[in-house]
């Protein structure tokens, strides 16, 4: 199984889990043409698309997903905000699991400034994969994880520097603190979960102004002893369960 990163920032987010025979799309925040290119224009293998919340950098192209015949899972608020409907539009119901091909999917609540979810995804090839972006915390703990995709948007230190330098508005501090994962929060989350079977940790949605990619990656590597990557367009990694 490969993880393909098409976008992981406020400009647009999209990831694909692809084993060659079937593919699951996470988020619809990049142009659909880019999705088709990443799939080698083989749309038949797409078994579904998962959306975390309604913001455009995650859901702008949700209509294209549905119109291409992909079963797409999202909160009711997303369908209302994007004014998209039809038999391929699946509404998340709390505590309910879903199956797309051989992918088992369990949504869980996240903490953002609009209704938002993360996903626990399981497949025979990649094992159990955790996916959380755009959330200031995670109230759940998980066992048996094999791959972790988690937001690490900013650090308090880099945010303070960016505000002082005028690169980030002071008003952004409160919003970030209540809607995105800070470095120390990311580290605390990882420390509180069993990572013994984890092969890869991928850091998502790093802020352009308020993060430090090399430092973030090295900090998480030092803490966990795992292979750590910062998500960026074009990144492809093998996420087969070891």
Please tell me what each predicted stretch does:
Residues 1-39, 117-134, 146-147:
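Conserved beta-strand hairpin/beta-sheet module of binuclear metal-dependent hydrolase folds
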Residues 17, 27, 53, 105, ...:
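Divalent metal-coordination and catalytic microenvironments
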Residues 30-31, 55, 75-81, 93-96, ...:
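Short, polar loop motifs at secondary-structure junctions
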Residues 31-76:
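Active-site metal-binding motif and surrounding structural segment of the metallo-beta-lactamase
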Residues 54-59, 80-81, 113-115, 137-140, ...:
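Active-site environment of divalent metal-dependent phosphoester hydrolases
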Residues 60-69, 83-85, 211-218:
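Metal-dependent catalytic neighborhoods of phosphoester/phosphodiester hydrolases
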Residues 74-126:
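Metallo-beta-lactamase
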Residues 143-234:
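Cap/insert and terminal regions of metallo-dependent hydrolase folds
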């Amino acid at each position: 199984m490969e993880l393909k990163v098409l976008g992981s920032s406020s400009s647009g987010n999209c990831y694909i889990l692809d084993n060659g025979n079937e593919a699951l799309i996470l988020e619809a925040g990049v142009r659909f043409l880019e999705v088709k290119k990443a799939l080698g224009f083989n749309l038949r293998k797409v078994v579904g698309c998962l959306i975390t919340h309604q913001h455009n950098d995650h859901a702008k192209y949700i209509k294209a997903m549905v119109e291409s015949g992909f079963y797409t899972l999202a909160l009711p608020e997303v369908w209302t905000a994007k004014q998209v409907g039809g038999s391929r539009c699946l509404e998340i119901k709390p505590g309910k699991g879903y199956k797309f091909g051989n992918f088992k999917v369990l949504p869980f609540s996240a903490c953002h400034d609009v209704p938002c979810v993360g996903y626990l995804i399981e497949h025979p090839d990649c094992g159990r994969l955790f996916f959380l972006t755009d959330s200031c915390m995670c109230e759940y703990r998980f066992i048996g994880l094999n791959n972790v995709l988690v937001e690490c948007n900013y650090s308090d230190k880099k945010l303070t520097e960016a505000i002082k330098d005028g690169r980030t508005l002071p008003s952004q501090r409160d919003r970030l603190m209540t809607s995105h994962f800070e470095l120390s929060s990311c580290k605390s989350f990882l420390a509180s979960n069993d990572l013994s079977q984890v092969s890869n940790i991928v850091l998502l949605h790093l802020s352009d102004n308020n993060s430090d990619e090399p430092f973030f990656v090295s900090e998480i590597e030092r803490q966990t002893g795992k292979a750590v990557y910062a998500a960026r367009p074009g990144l492809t990694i093998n996420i087969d369960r070891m």
